[in-house]
């Protein structure tokens, strides 16, 4: 089973999915005039309470829910594995891919808010399945996407959730995420910055090594062996594409219920999640590990790929405990975030009563996840999660003119008068 899943994943990566996602990222980056430059604006808007419209949760709560699902163990273990397999240069390609992914995240969240649907309890529902059915009239494709979302939520994480449904559940999940995301992020990043400060003398060299090994397979000093450039590119891009979920359609579901009057503004807020997840978290993790490897080369000989970050944190007081607690919080947050996505998809497929059935099955997967091999569980989850990208990107490309036209219009409308005359 494990070999089959591995072969299936590799076939997707090598031929179709990487090209599809990366191509979409680059396309929207170009067509939206490098919308990534509005990240500072998005950060400010995410903490603002001004001009909030209808919706179930605040823009910040929507962002926190998305971050809870995306900032997971992949940011730690995933980067460790990427460095072990693809060399330090993999961090560079992960970072670059994340930057391009910001544009796609904006596009999918824009559509989710633009075509969201108001439910009986006053909250809003949206995402690729609603866009595919109500706008593009592709119901079968919409059902396929929703089924993949439910399946992915079972694999990525399962936990005992409340049986209450409706607005109260969404609000509770959002409240937990608004508290949990800052706590776990500050705890983990605090440990990373402590180590970066401790290894300050070799940090510039670590950054240089990351950039150098992204383009050359020659060995570098400090006990870090060179790796084939193409391996580093493949591994780095794959981690960059999937750690932040840009293009998968999952983040858009939380954006749809945000209290907002503007799809453009919510899109800008939501795209900051990719910035925090990949550009910040993955970059900091990479620099922490590589600088530690340069400072303590002997300690990293014959070490398992998923233990690189643990080894780095072992060089600070209580570091391994800090990392362990961070991992537990990240995993718990992912469970909460993906349970919300699963409920959104189940509600679309079966109505509000279907959410109760989904929650019961979600509980059962706690046991299944414990008895199945970790490789099998994650292999299945990765496949479903990967396949979600296909119908989601279909909706993005078919509605690309709407996304581009309204984004450009909003930019002109809000630009200073001097710029409008140019």
Which sequence ranges carry the predicted segments?
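Membrane-interface loop-to-helix entry segments
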Residues: 20-27, 35-44, 164-211, 346, ...
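Flexible loop linkers connecting adjacent transmembrane helices
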Residues: 34-57, 81-83, 87-91, 95, ...
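Transmembrane helix-loop junctions in multi-pass membrane proteins
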Residues: 31-36, 74-79, 155-167, 171-175, ...
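Selective recognition of specific alpha-helical transmembrane segments in multi-pass small-molecule
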Residues: 100-108, 171, 181-201, 234, ...
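Alpha-helical membrane segments and immediately flanking helix-loop junctions
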Residues: 53-85, 111-129, 133, 147-150, ...
